[in-house]
């Protein structure tokens, strides 16, 4: 059998890319040494494009990243590379994310969310210490503590509003309450939603900021208006209006605006795709698509396992990818079409324990991160965060774990490998969990 180390042997390849025009080379077949690897191909692309400074490229053959020589890859794929023209896709390589300073908490971090206000990134966290928190990650400083829940807080999300200076947040937790925190220059208030009969596992804010959805262990999805009731605020009895602290000086109790019935078990996570379309996952092994305006279930895709996390990426008007983090340790990608149904399911095998959360890269439509538990004895082999390129399912792009220096003293070492929440901003991937910290992994834009 031929070896990639043999000299003189050549293969014919055809290069193509989905990158911008400035990175496009001819797709005409060319002959290259069979022992060429990623670095050699990258040098070839840089030479053809005359790039200065040069850029690192990555390469895919039939949806698998090239991690050996061209010939070895062809032989492993059981293809007759000597006779065929090999189609090679190239893309800009993603540098390994670099760990940054962490943000400490008093207890486990159960939820994470991110947003940008006037060009400044914000993080929101939900913690088992009964509090939510707002952070400026560039300074790793806690800007605000959201006090009011009486039990662990599990879900958190930012609310987009017309008030460009405001940072509004929704939280939910084991006290069965939903809290909407609104901060204005003239006044601040907390809207407290009551009605769930079980732990509120997750909250998700509508893109317009008018509605917050909450999912619970009572199998229900409730919808809450983010608009205060003027009549109640003007004439509410004492139990509906009370001081909470010097920042959020008004509380208003609210009943649900509506319900979405049809979940067969606990609702673990939700994500909005548009102002009227919501996706949910939970203990009933299904990804559910909801028509919020009509108040009904629109579509159900049966999954392989219980879903712990869900995220959506809107590629275009007719192409939506839904990613789930599942109890069997895998992330799954569902290709939803507006015409109905799904087109295939991609499985990304990630962990020996359960996967807990999933997030898309906001600057690269192909990349998705998933976090979870590694149920293995040798912790040196454990990487609780993985970054995948959804074009390649054999192995992740990057395996990440918390640096030893970022694990607090007194924390069980295994806890630093149990990540429960993720969020991805243009500058960094953030993860939190049993280590009682939010860990930052700074990413570099390659466009």
Curated annotation (Swiss-Prot):
Function statement: Required for maturation of ribosomal RNAs and formation of the large ribosomal subunit.
WD repeat start-end pairs: 107-147, 148-191, 195-234, 262-300, 304-344, 350-398, 414-447
GO CC annotations, alphabetized: nucleolus; nucleoplasm; preribosome, large subunit precursor
Pfam families xrefs: NLE, WD40
Similarity comment: Belongs to the WD repeat WDR12/YTM1 family.
Gene Ontology molecular-function annotations: ribonucleoprotein complex binding
Descriptive protein name: Ribosome biogenesis protein WDR12 homolog
Lineage summary: Eukaryota, Choanoflagellata, Craspedida, Salpingoecidae, Monosiga
Subcellular location(s) per record: Nucleus, Nucleolus; Nucleus, Nucleoplasm
Region (Ubiquitin-like (UBL) domain): 11-92
InterPro entries given in the database record: NLE (IPR012972), WD40/YVTN_repeat-like_dom_sf (IPR015943), WD40_repeat_dom_sf (IPR036322), WD40_rpt (IPR001680), WDR12/Ytm1 (IPR028599)
GO biological process entries: maturation of 5.8S rRNA from tricistronic rRNA transcript (SSU-rRNA, 5.8S rRNA, LSU-rRNA); maturation of LSU-rRNA from tricistronic rRNA transcript (SSU-rRNA, 5.8S rRNA, LSU-rRNA)
PROSITE patterns referenced in this protein's UniProt entry, alphabetically: WD_REPEATS_2, WD_REPEATS_REGION
Assigned keywords, A-Z: Nucleus, Repeat, Ribosome biogenesis, rRNA processing, WD repeat
């Amino acid at each position: 059998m031929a070896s990639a180390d043999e000299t003189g042997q050549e293969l014919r390849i055809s290069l193509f890319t989905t990158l911008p025009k400035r990175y496009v080379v001819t797709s005409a077949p060319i002959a290259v040494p069979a022992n060429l690897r990623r670095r050699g191909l990258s040098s070839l692309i840089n030479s053809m494009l005359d790039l200065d400074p040069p850029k690192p490229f990555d390469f895919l053959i039939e949806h698998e990243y090239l991690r050996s020589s061209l010939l070895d890859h062809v032989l492993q794929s059981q293809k007759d590379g000597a006779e065929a023209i090999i189609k090679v896709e190239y893309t800009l390589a993603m540098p390994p994310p670099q760990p940054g300073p962490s943000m400490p908490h008093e207890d486990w971090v159960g939820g994470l969310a991110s947003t940008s206000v006037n060009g400044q990134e914000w993080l929101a966290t939900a913690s088992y210490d009964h509090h939510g928190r707002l952070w400026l990650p560039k300074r790793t400083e806690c800007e605000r503590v959201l006090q009011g829940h009486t039990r662990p807080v599990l879900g958190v999300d930012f609310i987009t509003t017309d008030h460009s200076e405001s940072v509004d947040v929704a939280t939910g937790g084991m006290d069965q309450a939903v809290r909407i925190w609104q901060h204005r220059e003239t006044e601040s208030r907390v809207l407290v939603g009551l009605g769930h009969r079980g732990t509120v596992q997750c909250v998700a804010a509508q893109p317009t900021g008018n509605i917050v959805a909450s999912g619970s262990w009572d199998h229900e999805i409730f919808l809450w208006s983010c608009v205060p009731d003027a009549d109640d605020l003007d004439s509410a009895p004492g139990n509906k209006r009370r001081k909470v602290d010097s920042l959020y000086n008004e509380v208003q109790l609210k009943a649900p605006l509506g319900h979405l019935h049809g979940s067969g078990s606990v609702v673990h996570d939700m994500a909005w795709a548009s102002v009227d379309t919501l996706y949910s996952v939970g203990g009933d092994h299904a990804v559910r698509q909801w028509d919020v305006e009509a108040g009904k279930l629109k579509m159900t895709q049966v999954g392989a396992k219980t879903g712990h996390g869900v995220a959506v990426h809107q590629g275009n008007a007719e192409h939506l990818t839904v990613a789930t983090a599942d109890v069997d340790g895998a992330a799954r990608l569902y290709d939803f079409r507006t015409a109905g149904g799904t087109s295939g399911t991609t499985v990304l095998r990630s962990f020996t324990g359960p996967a807990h959360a999933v997030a898309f890269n906001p600057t690269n439509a192909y990349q998705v991160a998933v976090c979870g538990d590694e149920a293995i004895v040798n912790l040196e082999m454990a990487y609780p965060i993985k970054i995948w390129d959804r074009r390649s399912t054999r192995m992740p792009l990057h395996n990440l774990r918390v640096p030893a220096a970022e694990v607090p003293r007194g924390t069980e070492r295994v806890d630093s490998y149990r990540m429960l929440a993720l969020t991805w901003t243009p500058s960094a991937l953030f993860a939190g969990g049993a280590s009682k910290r939010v860990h930052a992994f700074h990413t570099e834009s390659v466009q």
